[in-house]
Design a protein with these regions (language model features):
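Short extracytoplasmic
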Residues: 13-39
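N-terminal membrane-anchoring alpha-helices
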Residues: 1-14
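Acidic/histidine-rich helix-loop elements
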Residues: 17-26, 50-58, 83-86, 120-130, ...
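Core catalytic region of metal-dependent phosphoesterases/phosphodiesterases
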Residues: 29-108
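Binuclear metal-dependent hydrolase catalytic cores centered on His/Asp/Glu-rich metal-binding motifs
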Residues: 90-95, 108-150, 159-161, 221-223
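Conserved beta-sheet core of the metallophosphoesterase superfamily
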Residues: 156-233
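Active-site-proximal beta-strand elements of phosphoester/diester hydrolases
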Residues: 15-25, 109-119, 150-154, 207-213
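Active-site neighborhood of phospho(di)ester-bond hydrolases with catalytic His/Asp-centered motifs
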Residues: 20-22, 43-49, 72-79, 100-102, ...
């Protein structure tokens, strides 16, 4: 498990440390918890795909329960949550984590919002080549809130289409799984972006942070692409 560290300076009220964990897809919870504890975060942020499907969700639920015992834990809804036959939001809420289903809350002076995957309207996930749109009305309303705003948004491909022109300070995403196979610093494929995707890992335009994620939803292995969690430190700018 790789811990990737990013440090940004911005208009936060105080320095804050977030552990960012994405795309669990049934990955065993113990190594993820150990890595989270190593980062000593103020809170844990999970931008979707805690659950894989009806047959593979228990490890993700266990991780959420353990995280919520030790840290404030905030979760948004990814596309795989909608592969559950039961209500995924209710299931996630039972863990004690704060589930942000097109909602926001405040933590340490930071407004944390969760933009739900557009697959809520396409639960069979027939849009293989493109991603259904999110709730743009909620997104617009969130962007108008005063203060420093962090958006948990599972799909990085939403950024150019719906988010780039919004007044949102930081966007945290996953979904691309680092491009699955990585060669010469580039990923090969990402769902919703296709071959040679633009957004696979790292920081883009100074405000879109994309995690490689932890698990693997495909039968194809990850190559040159270790599971990662991110330690994101946001430091208060000096005036």
């Amino acid at each position: 498990m790789k811990i990737t560290k990013y440090a940004l300076k911005s208009k936060v009220e105080e320095n804050v440390r977030f552990a960012v964990v994405s795309d669990l897809h049934g990955y065993p919870s113990a190594p993820v918890l150990n890595a989270i504890r190593e980062t000593e975060p103020n809170a844990v942020l999970i931008p979707g795909d805690v659950i894989h499907n009806d047959n593979n969700y228990k490890n993700g639920i266990e991780l959420l329960k353990e995280c919520a015992k030790d840290y404030p834990t905030f979760v948004s809804i990814g596309n795989h949550e909608f592969k559950m036959s039961s209500d995924p939001v209710a299931l996630l809420k039972e863990t004690g984590a704060t589930v942000l289903d097109n909602e926001y809350t405040e933590f340490m002076g930071v407004k944390i919002g969760g933009l739900t995957s557009g697959y809520t309207a396409d639960k069979k996930q027939t849009h293989f080549g493109s991603t259904p749109p999110p709730n743009t009305e909620w997104l617009k309303a969130f962007s108008k809130i005063e203060g420093y705003k962090v958006l948990l948004c599972h799909h990085p491909e939403y950024y150019p289409a719906y988010i780039r022109d919004k007044n949102i300070d930081l966007i945290l995403s996953g979904h691309a799984h680092g491009g699955q196979w990585r060669f010469f610093g580039r990923g090969l494929f990402a769902p919703g972006q296709g071959i040679f995707p633009k957004y696979t890992c790292g920081i883009y335009e100074g405000r879109l942070v994309v995690s490689k994620g932890v698990g693997n939803p495909h039968f194809i292995p990850r190559i040159n692409n270790k599971p990662e969690i991110i330690l994101l430190t946001i430091e208060k700018e000096e005036k």
